[in-house]
A protein has these predicted regions:
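Charged catalytic cores and adjacent phosphate/nucleic-acid-binding surfaces used
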Residues: 15, 23, 214-374, 382-400, ...
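Short, Lys/Arg-enriched N-terminal segments with co-localized hydrophobic residues
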Residues: 7-21
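Charged, compositionally biased N-terminal leader segments and the immediate start
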Residues: 21-46
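Accessory alpha-helical DNA-binding modules that contact the DNA backbone or grooves
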Residues: 23-24, 38, 48-254, 275-276, ...
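Short, conserved loop-to-beta-strand elements that form functional interface hotspots
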Residues: 435, 440-443
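Two-metal-ion RNase H-like nuclease active-site motif
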Residues: 207-210, 368-372, 443
Length: 609
């Protein structure tokens, strides 16, 4: 089944694997279950009115501000907008028992492989139903065969172009097989780190590899511990509740498969070896090569266990300094300490030699954030809930940017609804007081020709504007680039959202000339978003050094559709650090008293021009 809400469903699945129910079924889990039922009914070709009833119920649950269990016990679930008596009874069963038999039975009617087809870009319920019923295709392998032998192209409503796009989606899925997004693994990785830290026999612990370097996806997880009792620690690692199966087990290395599907490795070393192992297993490979070369230049040999003199009769190595911490190793090699996120051999050694490494941004530097959605479009939390969550996180401001009218699939707001929301925001700001502010904005669609979804008269009434591409992804690079540059040329556009439209491990970025867009952003004073949603992390970290050199500012935005997703900011900070960004490069490190001027700067410049 597709991950409709990623982390929430993944957490639910892990709990089920462990053979215990969630202590309380959440609103998101109920909404996910109802949406799954709607999708399965659509797969079966059921009555559209029945499907719509479940979709309406999903929407009703998403916007419901009360307690579902209390409503179930009081018999008032039917009072929620969009929920009829029959579905109310199903919801009551789900929230009180943790299971819904009709959902389980319905899922059992389908071949297991059919749900994997949802992972293919462009394959929705209608197309999956068509290939299933007309061609008896029940999994991705059969779908690929059907595309290659012409059967899929020959179906009504498909054609050669659709078949080619499906094949591309299948190839993309193969390419990404075995990779995991940060949002899928971070919670479990941090939990494992906490559990290892609390182990009585563990002296030091670290996560290494691409996770520590904050790459956008990971193939596996690498944990490192130092201990005097390797047998005990290794045995406890493979017995952890996350473990589905043991791949290999030994005193110095153990590999397991977690219930989430990712492989996790534990390496066990002596405490004196820890800084060397930590550096080596963090990588990257290219970074490690340079580290070893620098050691050899001093007459030393460096590996994952030690730094020592080269064993050669004619060499006169420098005295080997004592290394207790990873920073000591860099110092010994004539370098300032290089943060893990920068270890890609992309300029960090030169900067470390010249003492010009940046002081990278920290999560604690953020004072607020923009590009957040509410239940007025496709969000699952109300305006007030989003504001309360931001306040609880210690933020000073929150920018709301619900979808604009062309995003019909996301319940985009028209002019009337948008201005009503602005009025609501102004009123809520008065209620919340002077120490916190909600900024009224909109995520405005960029049309194919580069025009915007709202005219300037509407945009001028907003505090800020995010503009994004949400349709027609298949343009050539030149046309897509021209489209985006035209859009950000509007003086009311404050920031450009998710530059490439990519969905990590799911949808490839559309073709766009990053350098040209960055130049245009610099020329117009447009902020570029670093979309912190772990499915996006867009603009990619590789382009931020160029943007920074051109004076383009970054806004780290969570693209939150729920209160819990505001915390996606931490993933954005990881990517920003990987892009060499400091607090001065990111606009939402500015306090409330200064951010208004930042948001208004482009518009004011446009007035003077």
């Amino acid at each position: 089944m597709p991950h409709l809400r990623g982390d929430a469903l993944a957490a639910l699945s892990r709990s089920a694997y462990r053979g215990r129910l969630m202590p309380e079924v959440t609103k998101d889990q109920v909404a996910d279950t109802l949406e799954e039922i709607a999708m399965m009914l659509e797969l079966k070709g059921e009555n559209p009115f029945k499907i719509r009833a479940y979709r309406n119920a999903t929407r009703g649950i998403e916007t419901f501000a009360g307690n579902l269990r209390q409503s179930a016990e009081a018999g008032t679930l039917g009072d929620i907008e969009g929920i009829g008596e029959a579905i109310a009874q199903k919801i009551a069963t789900l929230v009180t028992t943790g299971t819904l038999e009709s959902h389980t039975n319905l899922k059992a009617e389908f071949p297991p492989g059919i749900f994997d087809m949802f992972d293919i870009s462009g394959m929705g319920p209608k197309k999956i139903h068509a290939v299933w019923k007309e061609l008896s295709i029940t999994d991705i392998a059969e779908l690929e065969k059907g595309c290659r032998d012409g059967r899929v192209a020959g179906m009504k409503g498909f054609g050669e172009k659709t078949a080619a796009n499906i094949l591309k989606g299948i190839e993309d899925r193969k390419k990404h097989a075995g990779r995991f997004r940060m949002g899928e693994i971070a919670a479990d990785a941090e939990r494992m780190l906490d559990d290892l830290r609390s182990h009585p026999e563990v002296l030091r612990v670290a996560a290494c590899g691409s996770y520590r370097r904050r790459r956008e996806t990971c193939g596996d997880l690498d944990f490192l511990v130092s201990t005097r009792e390797p047998k005990i620690v290794s045995k406890d690692f493979i017995a952890h509740e996350f473990v589905e199966s043991v791949i290999a087990h030994g005193d110095t290395k153990s590999s397991v498969r977690w219930l989430s599907g990712i492989q996790a490795d534990l390496r066990v070393v002596k405490d004196a070896e820890f800084p060397f192992a930590m550096n080596y297993f963090t990588g990257s490979k290219e970074h490690n090569i340079v580290m070893r070369q620098r050691a050899l230049a001093r007459g030393w040999t460096l590996n994952e266990y030690r730094l020592g003199p080269v064993d050669a009769p004619k060499t006169k190595p420098e005295p080997v300094p004592e290394i207790r911490e990873e920073a000591d190793l860099y110092r010994a090699l004539g370098l300032d300490y290089i943060e893990p996120e920068l270890r890609e051999n992309m300029g960090e050694f030169k900067a470390a030699e010249e003492h010009t490494l940046p002081k990278l941004i920290e999560v604690e530097n953020l004072r607020g954030t923009f590009h957040n959605h509410t239940t007025l479009s496709d969000g699952r939390s109300t305006l007030r809930e989003m504001a309360d969550a931001a306040i609880e996180l210690g933020l000073q401001y929150l920018g709301i940017a619900d979808h604009s009218k062309s995003s019909v699939q996301a319940h985009g707001l028209d002019e009337k609804a948008l201005l009503a929301q602005v009025k609501e925001i102004r009123a809520l700001n008065k209620e919340l007081g002077p120490d916190f502010r909600i900024f009224a904005g909109s995520e405005v669609d960029i049309h194919k020709d580069g025009s915007l979804d709202f005219d300037d008269e509407i945009l001028a009434q907003l505090d800020y504007v995010v503009t994004s591409v949400h349709s027609v992804f298949n343009l050539g690079e030149a046309e897509m680039t021209e489209r985006i540059i035209k859009a950000i040329g509007n003086r009311h556009v404050t920031m450009l959202g998710h530059l490439t439209g990519r969905l990590l491990l799911q949808r490839e970025p559309y073709a766009v000339d990053h350098a040209a867009v960055i130049e245009a952003a610099a020329a117009t004073g447009t902020i570029i978003e670093l979309n912190a949603n772990p499915r996006r992390l867009d603009m990619d970290w590789r382009w931020w050094p160029l943007a920074k050199s051109k004076g383009v500012k970054c806004a780290i935005n969570p693209d939150a559709h729920h209160t819990s997703q505001i915390q996606f900011l931490k993933f954005g900070v990881g990517t920003a650090r990987k892009g060499w960004l400091t607090r001065d490069d990111v606009v939402n490190t500015q306090p409330l008293g200064k951010i208004e001027a930042v948001l208004a700067a482009k518009t004011q410049r446009g007035k003077k021009a």
